[in-house]
Amino acid sequence: MKVRRTGAVAALGIVGIALMGCGVQPTGVIGAGEPASGLTRGVRLYFASDSGLRGVSRPDTEIKNLGAVVKMLAAGPGPAELRDGLTSLLQQLGGYTVTGTGTQVTVQLDGPYPESGRDQGTGQLVCTLARAQSVLDPEVRTDDVEVTLRPSDGAALGPYRCAEFLNG
């Protein structure tokens, strides 16, 4: 019994010495930059696809107000996005004014709203404005934004949240 225990201790000692002398030197902390973030930052436009709405990041685009985002959305997807099968179903709005305060966004429309309010074109508008409001007001989460459409002809539509238009 004593021989086995002494042999085991000696073997552990030899293994320990061998591991200490294997040539691996200790290192300090190595900086790797900023941590990865989960969601992209900046403007995100929503376009229609065969599988529902898809967000397209525009990280290098700075926005000053919600009206500018509606103009970007109305311009439609770029060539690469078109090749990926994205399109815009947003109808021409004519004149409009967009305001946002906290989690509330209102689109005042000159004339009637050309859609039902439960279509992908409306979803494009709602999701794009919700994201833009959260960019303009960092205290606001995109999921909490409610968008109301107020045509001068007809009843108000909404408030809508982006999640109502996303599949899955």
Model-derived segments and spans:
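Bimodal "functional hotspot" detector
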Residues: K2-G168
